[in-house]
Every structure is written in structure tokens, then in C-alpha cells.
Amino acid sequence: MALRLYDTLTKEKRDFAPLDPSNVRMYVCGPTVYDFAHIGNARPVIVFDVLFRLLRHLYGPDHVKYVRNITDVDDKINDRATRDFPGLPLNEAIRKVTEQTEKQFHDDVDALGCLRPTIEPRATEHIGEMRSIIDRLVEGGFAYVAEDHVLFSPQAMNAADGILPRYGSLANRSLDEMIAGARVDVAPYKRDVTDFVLWKPSKPGEPSWPSPAGIATQGRPGWHIECSAMAWKHLGEKFDIHGGGIDLVFPHHENEVAQSCCAFHTDRMATTWMHNGFLQVEGEKMSKSLGNFLTISDQRDQWGPAVLRLNMLKTHYRQPIDWTQHNLSETGRELDRWFEFLESASGGDPNDANDVMSALADDLNTSAAITALRVQFKNKNSAALRSGLDLLGIPIGREFIQGRKHVRLYAEGAFVAAGGGTATFSTASSSVERSDIQQLIDARAAARARKDFKESDRIRDQLAAMGVVLKDGKDADGKPTTTWEIAR
């Protein structure tokens, strides 16, 4: 099966041909560990996890190398460390911030069903590679030293003869456009407004290392050089796929291309560039000032990992996504129906999931893949539905629908639809009579029996609004049962 991927550089969808099919290599920009990851950060992690799974399926698990970095040296980290741990030396405070944030990131993305990358390098472990690349760039005339800074010159890159790409080609911008749109307050040590920092001197107390290019004072790397160095160390001078969010195309990825191609005299850093679209919340840009800033951890409290992952994949990765409560609720209900079916169903042909595979092979078209899953559910092909969910990395089970706030099942409240007493239970929103809960459960059971799923879903939502969460199953005789819990 041919894999076709959209390349940001060429602006076209092309057949994917790895440089070495026995060693398929992919690099994705990872987190800067200064704050908990928000739900927008989860999008590239999930998208490229699906691609990683697909590549492993096509080429074999032992023939795919996936690198996703950890940026652990950055001004934002320094600022957070100073704010959160004012009584500690800065380096010790930085270590606390980065360790805590990295642990939370791993907890979050592991919960979302994402495989760990083959290699997860930290920037601070690759300072030597950064200095080596910078020295090459200075020696080649592509970078210069000024006031203990090392700066890259896009003008020098575009003036060079040979196979080097033009600076701005990835973002489809010309240098003239960049110069015209540049800020007026340009640092005095820059020769040109488009020059960017490869290395800078450290302030007292900040992390610092011996500088490249013969600079006597110690310093630290700029952001862009970090990824060039880590990709070179673990994937080589040229590799197959470089991914990240659309916001990274310029300047970050453009600068990576410039650094790597000029240092190693190559025409491309990666043969395919892939970028996922923006995420907004309820039709608005996510912002702390708007009060709609959603961390992955917050969303895990409210929604199960299967809901978060499937909801993310319903939109094609290159399209913008609107993250809404309504869509999450719809996704949860759909998964509930699928998982209820899978609890009791068996049989079918797993090869029927080839439609899911074909959709993924067409530029990772997860929305089409999910449409194929709906067909398998409609056809009651449990084997194909399971296989397709596995390809998408969706964990199967009712426990993966509910968020962490819905974790405790009341012992006295766990009863089948035919039972129940008259005790009153306090929920997050009201006091509820057990008999009222039972009446609604009975009405919902009747709706399900006549296959009126719209009414069944309405009653489930009504109970959820009351703070009651339902769990459907079957008894020993195979008859439907419903248990409930109070959302805490």
C-alpha cells in the first residue's frame, strides 16, 4: 500500500519514499518544559503518534526511528523558575521546573494512548553538537560573531552558490518581505534585521556552557539550533519526515533548514515537512486572558482518554479544529455505543479494516478512517472495528470514556436497573432521590430496547447534568444492566 503525504515545502501530496526503508526516520518538535501542556499541544503529539503507528505497520517496528525532543533550556524556563522558586539558586530552581513539567507531560500523553518516541533527547545533553554546527556555520561564512553572540545570516545563505535552498522557501516568504515587515527596534549587534541568534552570552546565574567560535565568555544556545543539533545526532544530516504545528513553520523550522543545510551542505534537511493546523476553543483562540486555556490534565479530569483522542482525530490534521463541549459529548456518546457493542460482540473479518488503513495512507486522513469505523459498526463487524480502533491508537473499554473525576463507584449505588431503594444522594449539582434515578434509568432502558438512541442519549445527558454517571453492561445471563455512580 502506497503512503502519500502532504509536504509543506512543495505544497503538494506526494508518494512517500524513505531514504532507507530499513531505517525510516522522523523528527517532531517536542515541548518546552516550563508549564503544563495545553490541549493544543496534544494535537501534534496525537497526530504524529498515529503516523508513527502507521509507519511501524508499513515498514516494521524495528525499522522506524521517531525522535521527539525536550527543550529544557529557554528564557521561559528561567522566568518560571525565578517565579516559582525564588529562594533557590536559579539552576536548582530550573531543575525542579523542568523535572516536574516533563513528568506531567509524560503522564498526560501516556494517558492519551501515545507511544513513547524511540528517542527523546534533551537539549542540554546536546550542547557539544550545537557548538559543532555553529563552528561549521562560522567557518563557512554563514554566521558571524558580534558582542559575544553568534548570529546566522540569511543574506549569506541566499548569496551562496550550489545546492543550498533559498531562505524563506519553506514558509514561502522572500527576504524582501521579511525585511519590510521587520520590527524597527533591531538589536545593535545584528548586521541585518533578518539575522537570528545561534548562541548568546548568559547572564549571571543563568545556565551556561563554554561558547563556540572562540568566544571567551560562557553562554547558551538559541532555540533554533537545538533541534538542528538533536536531529543531526540521532537521525543524520538528512532524514525522512520533520513534523510539528503550523505555528512552527516560521521562524523555527525555516531556521532549522537554514542551519542544517548550510552546516552540512545539503539541499534539504528533511524530505517531507508535515504541519498540523491550529486548535481553537469554542470558536475562539485559546488564551489565559479569555479564561479558555485548557490543559491536557484539566481535560483528562472531565473526559476519558479515548474521547480526547478520537475527538482530536475527527478533524484532518492539516485543518483547524474547534474544540467544543458539544463535540466532545458527541464523541463520548459514539464511543459508548461502539464499546457497548464490542463488550458482547465477536466475529467479523479484521481485514475489513483495510478501509481504515487506506484512509490513513492518504495523507493521514483520520476523518475518513473514522467514517470507515462507523461503517464497520453499522455492519456489526466487531473484528474490523477493533482492528481499526487499534490502528488509531484508541484504547477500548468503557473506563476510557470517563474522566478522572468519575472514578468512584458508590457501593450502595451500584445496582441493576431492576433494583434500588429510596435513599437520597448528594451530587455536585443537587440532591437526588434514588427512586428518581431509577425512574430515569427505566425510561432509558425502554428507549434502548426500542432502539430510540436519541431519547436514550437525552436521558443519559439529563442524569449527567444531575451529577449521575451511568455504566452499561450485561449480567451473567446476558441481559442488559445499568450501574451508576456519583460524579466527584
Swiss-Prot record:
Q: Where is this motif: 'KMSKS' region?
A: 285-289
Instruction: Spell out the subunit comment.
Output: Monomer.
Cite the binding residues for ATP: 288
Its main subcellular localisation, reduced to a broad class, is cytoplasm
Please report which protein family the annotation says this sequence is part of.
Answer: Belongs to the class-I aminoacyl-tRNA synthetase family.
Q: State the CDD domains in the record.
A: CysRS_core
Q: Which HAMAP family match?
A: Cys_tRNA_synth (MF_00041)
The gene behind this protein is: cysS
Family matches, as InterPro entries: Cys-tRNA-ligase (IPR015803), Cys-tRNA/MSH_ligase (IPR024909), CysS_C (IPR056411), Rossmann-like_a/b/a_fold (IPR014729), tRNA-synt_1_cat_dom (IPR032678), tRNAsynth_Ia_anticodon-bd (IPR009080)
Q: Which Pfam families match?
A: CysS_C (PF23493), tRNA-synt_1e (PF01406)
Q: Please tell me the species this chain comes from.
A: Rhodopseudomonas palustris (strain BisB18)
Q: Which UniProt keywords apply?
A: Aminoacyl-tRNA synthetase, ATP-binding, Cytoplasm, Ligase, Metal-binding, Nucleotide-binding, Protein biosynthesis, Zinc
Name listed for the protein in its UniProt record: Cysteine--tRNA ligase
